[in-house]
């Protein structure tokens, strides 16, 4: 079944450190945002290759369950002679339940912290320096029991895949803006630069797949419960190295706040 749960925390504050009359000379602020979500669900992507599409295109006469209350699988289809009409006939509900598309869970965690300082020595002239830090981590677990739907769609042993990823980046931004008027002419000028860094040594990915599990249920489907001496596949690598530097400027003008 599909499920989605989300939890977020957001905190913002701003403090005036130096004030002269109606002029806020030095201001400090921070933004903190944390989110955590968990999701599980069926395959929905790919217009012609997802569980909803397969159910819509399935033979409506094929039962979902057999007389014992179990899912209508290969032996039932073969006994009833369905393969005489189409060798690819299958039960789309059984296909969904007996695969990682219907047995999966993803967890995501995100933390963003921003601190900034604004200095306004004279009215309209504002310098703003900002530093931000962002961290993300996620995990995924998908389980497929042993099954046989058709002669070509089958899995001889159960299987579980787990992966985890983590990473972080930081960014520095500096801007200088000046807002002023000359009679009925209004100007707003801004220049700035930004630098963002993420990459090697700042994140990593790890994934492993194992089969022949001790238990044939979702709750205990973990790599460590495999009877095999080692995972069928395993890989891990760092995130790619990348950085972005930008310089920008902007001029806004209006006449008498009309044009």
Regions found by a protein language model. Give the residues of each.
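Short, intrinsically disordered, charge-balanced linker/junction segments flanking boundaries
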Residues: 249, 254-259
């Amino acid at each position: 079944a599909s499920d989605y749960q989300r939890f977020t925390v957001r905190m913002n504050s701003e403090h005036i450190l130096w004030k002269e009359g109606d002029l806020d000379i030095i201001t400090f602020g921070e933004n903190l945002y944390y989110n955590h979500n968990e999701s599980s669900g069926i395959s929905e992507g790919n217009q012609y290759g997802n569980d909803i599409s397969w159910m819509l295109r399935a033979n409506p006469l094929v039962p979902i369950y057999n007389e014992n209350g179990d899912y209508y699988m290969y032996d039932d289809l073969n006994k009833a002679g369905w393969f005489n009409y189409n060798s690819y006939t299958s039960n789309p509900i059984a296909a969904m339940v007996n695969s990682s598309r219907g047995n999966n869970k993803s967890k995501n965690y995100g933390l963003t912290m921003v601190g900034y300082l604004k200095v306004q020595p004279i009215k309209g002239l504002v310098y703003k320096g900002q530093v931000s830090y962002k961290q993300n981590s996620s995990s995924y677990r998908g389980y497929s029991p042993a099954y046989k739907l058709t002669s070509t769609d089958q899995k001889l042993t159960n299987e579980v895949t787990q992966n985890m990823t983590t990473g972080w980046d930081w960014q520095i931004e500096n801007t200088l803006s000046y807002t002023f008027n000359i009679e009925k002419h209004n100007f707003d000028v801004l220049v700035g630069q930004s630098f963002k860094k993420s990459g090697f040594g700042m994140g990593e990915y790890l994934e492993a797949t194992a089969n022949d599990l001790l238990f044939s249920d979702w709750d205990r489907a973990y790599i460590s419960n495999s009877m095999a001496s080692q995972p069928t596949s395993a890989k891990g690598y760092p995130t790619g190295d990348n950085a972005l530097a930008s310089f920008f400027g902007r001029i806004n003008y209006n006449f008498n706040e009309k044009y």
